[in-house]
C-alpha cells in the first residue's frame, strides 16, 4: 500500500511520461496488455491516463489469475524503484550529475544498489524467485520498457545496478555460489564474511559445483553437513539418526546426496570455504585412491548396502532382510 506522498509522485511520473504524446500512451498500453492486462488508456488526456494506469497497477485485484497478480506486483515494485531514483535526481543534497558514471564510449549510467530484506516474510517461493529475477532484469537493463522509462525520466542511458538480498530462504538464494556472501562467527565469536566470488577452483570443478549447487544450497544455513554417495545412504541416514535419538534439524545438520563419490570432495570443499564443517562418507571400494583426512569415513565393507546386510545378519535379523526383499 502506497502512502499519499508516494502515490502522488508515482502518478506524476506516469503523467510526465504519457505527456510525450499518443505514441507513449499506446506503448504503455501495449506493454501492459502483453503482460496479461486488459487496459485501454485515454489518448488525449495524459493525466486521466496516468490515473487509470495507477489504478490498474496499484488497485485491489477483484478477479484474475495468479499470473495477473504476479505481474501487478512486479510492475508495482519496478515503478516504486523508478520513483526512488527520480527522487535522487531531484534531490539537492548532492548533484545528480556527480553520481552518473560515464563510460569511455560516452554511455551514461546511474549506479543503483537495491537491498531486499527477507522476501520470504511476505512472498511464497515462486513469487520470491519471480520478483528477484524481475529486479535483476531492471538493474541489468534487460526490461526494455523500464529501460525506456529510465532513459526518458532520468536522462541517462541505463542503470549500473547491484541487488543485495538478505534471506534465510533457499528459494531466494541464487543458484550460483559465486554470488553469495555468508555471515558467520569465527572461533573468537567475531562476525566474518565468506564471499563466494573470492573462491577459486579450476574451470571444470567450477562448472560441476554450479551445476550441483541448487541441490546443496540449503547447507549454507546448517551448522554441519554430512555428504553421502547416493540414494541409499541419503534415504536411510535420517531414519538411522531418529533411531539413535538424533534429530538432524534440531542440531542444524544437513544431509547431502552428492550423487556419486567423485562429487563428494568437490562439494565438501565448497561448503568448507563457506566455513561450514563437512563430514564425508565413502564406500570402501574407493578408499585406496583417496588421502586419509579428518572427517572422512569409509564403510566397513565394499559398499554401504553390504554394511547394512552384514549388520542385519550378524544381529540375527535375516527375516528383516527377507521382508525387505519381499516388498
For each of these PLM feature ranges, what is it?
Residues 110-112, 143-164, 277:
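Loop/turn-to-beta-strand initiation segments
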Residues 130-131, 135:
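Conserved hydrophobic alpha-helix in the ABC-type ATPase nucleotide-binding domain
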Residues 1-118:
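Extended helical coiled-coil dimerization/tether regions that scaffold
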Residues 101-104, 152-153, 210-215:
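Pre-Walker A adenine-sensing motif
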Residues 172-327:
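Acidic, divalent-metal-binding catalytic cores of TOPRIM
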Residues 166-168:
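H-loop/switch region of ABC-family ATPase nucleotide-binding domains
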Residues 81-91, 102, 137-145, 242-246:
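Conserved helix-loop functional segments at active or binding sites
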Amino acid at each position: 500500500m502506497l502512502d499519499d506522498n508516494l502515490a502522488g509522485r508515482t502518478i506524476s511520473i506516469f503523467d510526465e511520461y504519457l505527456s510525450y504524446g499518443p505514441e507513449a500512451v499506446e506503448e504503455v498500453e501495449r506493454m501492459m496488455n502483453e503482460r496479461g492486462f486488459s487496459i485501454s488508456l485515454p489518448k488525449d488526456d495524459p493525466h486521466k491516463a496516468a490515473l487509470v494506469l495507477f489504478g490498474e497497477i496499484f488497485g485491489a485485484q477483484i478477479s484474475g489469475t495468479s499470473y495477473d497478480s504476479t505481474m501487478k506486483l512486479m510492475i508495482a515494485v519496478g515503478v516504486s524503484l523508478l520513483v526512488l531514483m527520480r527522487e535522487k535526481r531531484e534531490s539537492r543534497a548532492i548533484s545528480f550529475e556527480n553520481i552518473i558514471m560515464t563510460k569511455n564510449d560516452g554511455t551514461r549510467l546511474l549506479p543503483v544498489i537495491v537491498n531486499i530484506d527477507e522476501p520470504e516474510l511476505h512472498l511464497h517461493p515462486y513469487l520470491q524467485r519471480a520478483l528477484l529475477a524481475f529486479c535483476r532484469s531492471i538493474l541489468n537493463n534487460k526490461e526494455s520498457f523500464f529501460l525506456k522509462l529510465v532513459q526518458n525520466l532520468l536522462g541517462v542511458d541505463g542503470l549500473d545496478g547491484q541487488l543485495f538480498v538478505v534471506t534465510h530462504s533457499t528459494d531466494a538464494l541464487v543458484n550460483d555460489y559465486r554470488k553469495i556472501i555468508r555471515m558467520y562467527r569465527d572461533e573468537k565469536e567475531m562476525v566474518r564474511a565468506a564471499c563466494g566470488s573470492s573462491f577459486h577452483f579450476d574451470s571444470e570443478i567450477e562448472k560441476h559445483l554450479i551445476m550441483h549447487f541448487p541441490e546443496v544450497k540449503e547447507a549454507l544455513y546448517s551448522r554441519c553437513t554430512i555428504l553421502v554417495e547416493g540414494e541409499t545412504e541419503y534415504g536411510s541416514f535420517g531414519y538411522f539418526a531418529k533411531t539413535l535419538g538424533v534429530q538432524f534439524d534440531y542440531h542444524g545438520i544437513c544431509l547431502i546426496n552428492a550423487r556419486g563419490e567423485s562429487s563428494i570432495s568437490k562439494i565438501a570443499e565448497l561448503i568448507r570455504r563457506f566455513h561450514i564443517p563437512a563430514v564425508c562418507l565413502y564406500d570402501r571400494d574407493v578408499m585406496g585412491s583417496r588421502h586419509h583426512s579428518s572427517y572422512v569415513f569409509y564403510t566397513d565393507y565394499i559398499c554401504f548396502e553390504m554394511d547394512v546386510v552384514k549388520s542385519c545378519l550378524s544381529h540375527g535379523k535375516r527375516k528383516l532382510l527377507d521382508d525387505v526383499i519381499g516388498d
